Amino acid sequence: MGTSNWQNISYNIELVRKLDPDSILDVGVGFGRWGILFREFLEIWDNGRYDGNWQRVIDGIEIFPGYIKDYHRYFYNEIFLENALDHLQNSEKKYDLIHFGDVIEHFTKVDGTRLIELALQKGKYVLINIPIGRYWAQDGTEDNPFEEHKSVWYNNDFTKFRYHKIKTFY
C-alpha cells in the first residue's frame, strides 16, 4: 500500500477544520489516513463522541478493493470501489469538500485535469495533496498496478484553475 508524506498533515487538518464541511469525499482512501483524521478532528475532537453516530458524511473512493479493511467501515459512511474519474462523471452527489490525497498523479495529465474539473463542479471546496516535480516516479506493484504514477505535476499546473492556493512542503 502506498503512503504519503506526513509534513502536510497539520496544515491540512487546520484548513479542513476552518472549512467545517458537513460532507467530504475522500478520493483514494488507501490506508484511510484522511478519513480517520477528518472524522477525529471534525467530530471526536470537539465532543468526544466515539459511538459511531456521526453527524457528518465522510465518503470515500478506492479503486483497489484489497486496501479496504473492516476498520474503514467505522470511519467512512460509504466507500465506492471504482475508478474516481468514472465515479465523479456518473455521480450526482455533491460534497462540501472533495479531498485528493496523493491521487491525481495516478492518472494521466488529461484524466487528472478532468478529475479536478469534475471535483470543482461537485465540491464546494477541493483540497489536493500531490507530489510536485519529476522526482516522484513510481511503478505499480505486482499486487496493485494502480500505484503507478502516470503523470508529473508542477505548481503552475494548478494556476489555471480560477481559485487556488498553493502551499509546498519539503
Language model features by range: what are they?
Residues N5-D20:
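Conserved alpha-helix/loop element of class I SAM-dependent methyltransferases that forms part
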Residues D22-G30:
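Conserved class I S-adenosyl-L-methionine
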Residues P21-D22, R56:
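Nucleotide donor/acceptor-binding cores
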Residues D22, N77, D96, K124:
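Conserved acidic residues
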Residues L19, N90-K93:
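Glycine-rich phosphate-binding loop signature in dinucleotide/nucleotide-binding domains
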Residues G32-E78, N83:
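Class I SAM-dependent methyltransferase SAM/SAH-binding core
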Residues Y95-D102:
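Short SAM/SAH-binding signature in class I
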Residues G2-Q7, R33, L85-Q89, F100, ...:
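S-adenosyl-L-methionine-dependent methyltransferase catalytic module, highlighting the catalytic core
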